């Protein structure tokens, strides 16, 4: 919840407290705490800490071997930790780096995982806009918007609203008008 509120320092503090006695935690819980701490670090503008935490979590990933039914996204989701890194990079304003990671992640995510693919594409489009590549952002947004309309995903809609904000510098340009037309069906009735 502190991440959603943009309180990076509180997220880092909470995760540090959770990891204070990390040896007593199963690897899956340590990975979850580390990736959440990375999100907090991204909110605080600390790229080095983001990379350090995601890299540490990645080294723990092979140790996740329990059969508990909760918290298995780190094993089940292709490129899970790179999804977290790309999200953090996007939050840090590292558009080119985030975009490259989203390309890698999307190559791993099956077409059947439509909601995840749509969210990731919306984030990739936002990364392109942040990297001052508005044409690329709009091209990616076309696919994400189609999925958003078909699935009615609120999460995807939120990501596309973020894209819309990031594209404001081009709102009066042809590319901005194209984006508004593409996103129209997504935001109808919202």
Question: Whereabouts are the PLM-identified features?
Answer:
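Conserved binding/catalytic microenvironments
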Residues: 1-190
């Amino acid at each position: 919840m502190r991440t959603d509120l943009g309180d990076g320092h509180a997220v880092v503090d909470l995760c540090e407290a959770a990891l204070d006695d990390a040896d007593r935690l199963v690897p899956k819980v340590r990975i979850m705490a580390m990736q959440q701490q990375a999100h907090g670090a991204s909110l605080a503008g600390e790229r080095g800490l983001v990379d350090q935490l995601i890299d540490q979590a990645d080294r723990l990933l092979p140790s996740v071997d329990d059969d508990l039914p909760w918290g298995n996204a780190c094993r089940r989701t292709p490129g899970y930790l790179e999804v977290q890194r790309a999200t953090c990079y996007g939050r840090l304003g590292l558009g080119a780096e985030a975009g490259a990671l989203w390309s890698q992640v999307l190559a791993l995510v099956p077409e059947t995982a439509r909601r995840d693919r749509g969210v990731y594409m919306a984030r990739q489009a936002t990364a392109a806009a942040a990297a001052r590549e508005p044409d690329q952002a709009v091209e990616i947004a076309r696919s994400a918007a189609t999925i958003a309309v078909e699935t009615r995903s609120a999460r995807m809609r939120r990501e596309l609203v973020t894209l819309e904000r990031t594209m404001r510098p081009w709102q009066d340009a042809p590319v901005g008008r194209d984006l508004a037309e593409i996103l129209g069906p997504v935001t109808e009735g919202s």
